Design a protein with these regions (language model features):
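Residues at the C-termini of beta-strands that transition into short coil/loop
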Residues: 89, 141, 198
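Canonical P-loop GTPase G-domain recognition
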Residues: 170-225
């Protein structure tokens, strides 16, 4: 008698995909644009969110879902900006999944929100595998991490629709090769939109903010909303 083998990873991803589809429908009904923000620890996810809140909150109602293995340090920073935020602590899991986001949305209340930013757990591998019902996957690569990261961690670079190259103000102090980096990424993902930025100084955020605003408005128009 043959031994039956079960592909656990495939089953998990299948269940997640079904839940993510339900989330996507809910977001569309509410005309809520969702960004799944992914990066390694320390790349500048929370700093980027704070900049986006500063630049976008005058025109759009924003909510944030914070994902961390432990603590609510980042959520408190968001809360200080008078933005609705829900904290997810995964207690060891290296990524968020659609089930976690479903629960978080109940606490956040997506009704009336134009934009929800999901800060995924700091990791360059697992988060890219799990659909959260988002409109776009946006990743951050910070200059100190090195220009070779697309070759070492290709999945996130190929799955993302937008890439922020953060901490460009530190470029003179590293051997980061911007041209080589962008060439590598373009070969892997020709359609990706890249933004060299500094969350610390604000450089590059005008273009990024304008682009996100355009994406939000385009999604609303596609959903038949004039709001």
């Amino acid at each position: 008698m043959a031994v039956k083998t079960i592909n656990v990873n495939k089953d998990i991803l299948g269940v997640n995909e079904a839940l993510a589809l339900n989330l996507k429908k809910a977001f569309e009904i509410n005309n809520t644009f969702v960004i799944n923000l992914m990066a390694a620890p320390g790349a500048g996810k929370t700093s980027t969110i704070l900049r986006l809140i500063e630049n976008l909150s005058a025109d759009f109602k924003i909510g944030v879902i914070e994902g961390d293995i432990a603590s609510d340090v980042d959520s408190r920073k968001i809360q200080e900006r008078n933005v609705d935020v829900v904290q997810i602590n995964t207690d060891g899991a290296c990524h968020l999944d659609a089930n976690m986001i479903t629960a978080a949305c109940s606490g956040l209340g997506i009704e009336g929100k134009d934009l929800v930013i999901i800060e995924n757990v700091g990791n360059l591998v697992c988060p890219a595998e799990f659909n959260l019902g988002e409109n776009i996957k946006m990743m951050i690569l910070s200059v100190p991490e090195g220009h070779d990261k697309p070759l070492k961690y290709p999945l996130m670079f190929t799955e993302s629709q937008a890439l922020l190259i953060n901490k460009v103000d530190l470029t003179p102090y590293t051997d980061f090769n911007m041209d080589e980096f962008q060439k590598t990424v373009r070969a892997m993902n020709p359609g990706i939109k890249m933004f060299p930025v500094s969350a610390k100084t604000g450089d590059g955020f005008s273009e990024l903010t304008e682009w996100i605003g355009q994406q939000i408005k385009a999604a609303k128009k596609m959903n038949g909303s004039s709001k």
